[in-house]
């Protein structure tokens, strides 16, 4: 797979594609009835390969625009809140909406007929995959949306909405057609940003998207889905992403220029020294470092601690340090920071993980050089070697050479585990839980090497983590963790819990770092886990079931009526 560094040389030869790159970081809202998006390619300005690259870049932009909301709602990252009804504005989905309707769907309509004339089956298959993914995710986040009448320009300036179920059916049809396109030898794209033109990998990604769609609506009882899912699983080696070599991910580079090729989260965490601009979730970090009797080495790759002891800081920097936990918080709920004792604060301990609680919207103190930052995986940041120094700027870690983890091999294993458990096969579910964990650990610990780094991780001067000991014990620690969670022994978590689905989903969340889409969907589909950290300032737990339509779309489309509230469920959530 090629990074955006490689892509840049080609893009600079086309002003049209350069405009698409700028749109990756755009938050502007363009209504469905705008006839020509300033970021969209036109037949006069681009060839088929440029259209394809534009769709791929907008696929990355679309995913980046929806992943954070899902992470915040599932406590993977911090939600400011303070309440669900006002946590997100009616413009929250404007960016993804624009990426889908003004860019992906429009480029699809322009590209596919031209590719069909040339018989470029691979191009068509990729386009159908990307369109299907966007369609599915729009339904997952928004419910019923315009589809059959959308992206038609002057033919329909006020497209009506289609039911989420019908859009899923249309997306499934595109997926099945894409599979057929990938089965035909054809012209390869000149610059495939995901798979380098590999039809085999695109076919596996398409099968995995089909599995995701059918599993997602399993509670809606489509009679054909069970047979299709079982067939996909039976031929998993050929049908699905089961190893990391076929991971569907968008790779970033290290170019700090215009256009910036680095992972967006790297820029927000490492652009300036000691200026991390977001908070980690206290409860999510605790799952890695405080809730089990085994070491989870992924913590060193996911999170970078700038400070070694939260208790050493004053009330201006950590104001909750002198507060009592809310009455609706159980004693087992993390509050303020990991190790905080709100009954006897002097007995508090800290290992430096500095985040916030779910829905904490307090003011922002001068703690940009103290907060825990995103680490090495998946944004290309700094591995946590225990040196406890503030972020030093743009040259740390992999310098932004990260990924958007859209459909990874570990996700496939967890989806199969869920399907097996939901159908009463606990032993198969356990086996796929174990293999999903193994895939996750392998991906995370091998990430630096995958992205082209000379070493597995970077240990710096002043590190308190012993490099030889850490790397030498990786395999033992990974095996111990998998055995502790999903082993066959009588004392494993799997064999001692009464809530196997809850355990499975919780472990899936820990593997999903960087992908809030699958976490948000899985939470609503399974109603697991049941012990997520409550909102800080209210016991009300009416979590967002779907997002509001973008305000400007409602204002400008007389066929679109805003939802009554955030509790409107999507069709498969029952």
Where are these regions (language model features)?
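Sec-dependent bacterial lipoprotein signal peptides
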Residues: 2-25
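Alpha-helical transmembrane segments of integral membrane proteins
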Residues: 12-13, 52, 125
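Short, compositionally biased low-complexity segments
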Residues: 23-34, 76-84, 139-149, 467-482
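Structured, solvent-exposed acidic/aromatic patches
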Residues: 46, 77-448, 497-499
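C-terminal functional modules
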Residues: 413, 421, 438-574
């Amino acid at each position: 797979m090629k990074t955006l560094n490689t892509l840049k040389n080609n893009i600079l030869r086309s002003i049209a594609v350069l405009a698409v790159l700028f749109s990756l970081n755009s938050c502007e809202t363009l209504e469905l009835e705008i006839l020509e998006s300033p970021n969209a390619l036109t037949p006069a300005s681009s060839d088929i390969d440029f259209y394809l690259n534009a769709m791929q870049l907008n696929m990355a932009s679309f995913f980046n625009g929806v992943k954070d909301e899902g992470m915040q709602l599932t406590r993977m990252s911090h939600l400011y809140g303070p309440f669900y009804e006002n946590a997100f504005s009616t413009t929250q989905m404007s960016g993804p909406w624009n990426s889908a309707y003004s860019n992906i769907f429009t480029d699809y309509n322009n590209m596919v007929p031209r590719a069909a004339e040339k018989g470029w089956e691979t191009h068509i298959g990729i386009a159908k995959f990307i369109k299907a993914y966007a369609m599915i995710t729009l339904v997952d986040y928004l419910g019923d949306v315009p589809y059959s009448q959308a992206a038609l320009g002057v033919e329909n300036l006020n497209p009506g909405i289609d039911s989420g179920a019908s859009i899923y059916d249309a997306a499934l049809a595109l997926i099945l057609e894409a599979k057929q396109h990938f089965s035909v030898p054809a012209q390869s794209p000149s610059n495939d940003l995901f798979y380098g033109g590999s039809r085999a990998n695109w076919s596996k990604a398409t099968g995995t998207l089909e599995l995701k769609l059918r599993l997602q609506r399993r509670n809606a009882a489509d009679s054909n889905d069970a047979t299709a899912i079982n067939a996909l699983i039976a031929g998993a080696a050929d049908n699905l992403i089961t190893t990391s070599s076929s991971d569907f991910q968008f790779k970033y580079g290290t170019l700090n220029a215009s256009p910036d090729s680095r992972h967006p989260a790297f820029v927000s965490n490492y652009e300036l020294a000691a200026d991390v601009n977001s908070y980690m979730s206290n409860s999510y970090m605790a799952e890695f470092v405080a809730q089990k009797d085994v070491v989870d080495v992924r913590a060193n790759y996911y999170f970078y601690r700038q400070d070694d002891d939260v208790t050493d800081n004053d009330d201006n920097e950590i104001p909750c340090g002198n507060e009592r936990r809310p009455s609706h918080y159980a004693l087992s709920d993390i509050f303020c920071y990991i190790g905080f004792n709100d009954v006897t604060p002097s007995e508090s301990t800290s290992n430096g993980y500095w985040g916030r609680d779910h829905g904490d919207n307090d003011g922002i103190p001068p703690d940009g050089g103290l907060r825990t930052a995103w680490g090495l995986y998946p944004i290309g940041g700094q591995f946590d070697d225990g040196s406890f120094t503030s972020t030093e700027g743009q040259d740390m870690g992999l310098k932004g050479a990260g990924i958007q983890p859209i459909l990874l091999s570990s996700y496939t294993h967890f989806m199969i585990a869920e399907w097996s458990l939901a159908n009463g096969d606990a032993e198969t579910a356990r086996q796929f839980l174990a293999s999903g964990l193994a895939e996750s650990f392998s991906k995370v610990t091998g990430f630096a090497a995958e992205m082209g780094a000379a070493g597995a991780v970077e240990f710096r001067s002043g590190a308190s983590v012993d490099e030889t000991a850490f790397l030498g014990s990786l395999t033992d620690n990974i095996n111990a963790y998998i055995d502790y969670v999903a082993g066959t022994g009588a004392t494993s978590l799997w064999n001692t819990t009464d809530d196997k689905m809850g355990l499975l989903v919780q472990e899936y969340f820990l593997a999903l770092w960087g992908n809030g889409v699958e976490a948000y969907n899985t939470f609503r589909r399974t109603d697991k886990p049941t012990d997520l950290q409550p909102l800080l300032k209210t016991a009300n737990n009416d979590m967002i079931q779907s997002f509001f339509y973008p305000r400007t779309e409602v204002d400008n489309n007389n066929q679109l009526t805003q939802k009554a509230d955030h509790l409107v469920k999507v069709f498969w959530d029952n």
